[in-house]
Amino acid sequence: MKTTEMTTAMFKDRVMDLEKMSDKWEFKGDKPAIIDFYATWCGPCKMIAPIVEEIANDYDGKIDVYKVDVDKNEELAAMFGIQTIPTLLFIPMEGKPVTSVGAKMMPELEEMIKQHLLK
């Protein structure tokens, strides 16, 4: 599976309805997810893009992997307080999402997947 470019509308449908957001996180997905917040002009984002694609392929059917262009989806970036990119949001089936800020290599990301998504 390739990564899917996510819009605000898709986020509301597949992850969480922003209008109904409260103190409690209510994930709509049917499997854990990773959201890569990036920008097309960001060097570190370009560096991890192939790694994120590899994760999407390696974990196909187990984890949904999305990409959010922060310049096109400012509302989503603001909602999660994204100020540094790349930022990866790891969304488990239960519990709150966990963020990873900055470019990380595959072993580090796989550890986060095991620790937070595929327990």
Give residue ranges: language-model regions.
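Non-catalytic, surface beta->alpha helical segment in thiol-disulfide oxidoreductase systems
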Residues: 84, 89-119
